[in-house]
Amino acid sequence: MVLTVAQDRALPSGPFESSHRSLQSGLRAWVERRTHHPLGYVEQLYTFADRDRTEAGARVISISYLGLTRQVRAAEGDARWQGWYRYFPWEDHRAGTPSVRSQMIAPRLAAWAKGAPTPAARRERRQRAAMVFGLDGQGWNEELVLQRYELLYEAGMVPEATRRADPLCLSPLPGEPMLHDHRRILATGIARLRAKIKYRPVVFELMPPSFTLLQLQQCVEALAGQRMHKQNFRRLIEQQELVEETGQIATETGGRPAKLVRFRRAIQQERAFAGTKLPVTRAT
């Protein structure tokens, strides 16, 4: 889920003001003021400064952040929670390969590659399409969210590219557009989070104080956009000693009662250090 504003077409943002002690404190203040929703874990993501980032054409520099929070209550004002696959339907492989990839993206990228001016350019386009979208026998890499979006933009297959007057833009792919380059920023954040969940327990920020292992697995699957083998997932959680039992049972599971677990205190302490300015690293 992603917290949006402007009728679901933008990410929360605002100008840096002299009263803000730091960029991060300014971010937290703006997001909470705009959405009435406090942030937990925050890290700087990327600086966007390309030309023509806005319809007005003004040169705007944006410093983006990845912020995590639990959806403990409904957003307020014009802020609303939206599933991020609404903006990137080709990224959700939990029910298998999405039809938009095979039925729309693959053939249109093939046509785009064929339209390149030279044999070398045609070959380079085909190779890029195969690599980032897992075509022609290539494997799917869930972390290449930004590369996929940027390739579709370059090929003129997303609404944000219509300013370039490319003929392919007349029939954009499914997936809600966003204002300016906010969908590119969102793609960058999803890619960062998909990579980070593999080596840091940031998923802690998204879970309630106690939960079942199935709920944890479903959260990870929603982030990665892929199904995970139940027993392999639980074995990995046990090997890494991420959680401990609470001694309580969840009965409202829609099936058999399940044990409630929580993240171990050591994991929570690592989370506390992650947001500081100290260069804290994992022990080797």
Language model regions located:
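Active-site segment of metal-dependent pyrophosphate-handling enzymes
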Residues: 20, 24-28, 32-161, 196-203, ...
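N-terminal strand-loop-strand
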Residues: 1-11
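Short, hydrophobic-biased segments on the C-terminal half of alpha helices
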Residues: 28, 233-237, 252
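Long, intrinsically disordered, low-complexity Ser/Thr/Pro-rich regulatory/activation regions
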Residues: 67, 241-284
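Short helix-coil junctions and helix-kink-helix linkers
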Residues: 218-227
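Charge-enriched amphipathic alpha-helical scaffolds
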Residues: 227-246
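Positively charged, polyanion-binding regions of nucleic-acid-associated proteins
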Residues: 190-211
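Short histidine-centered catalytic/ligand-binding loop motif
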Residues: 10-21, 203-206
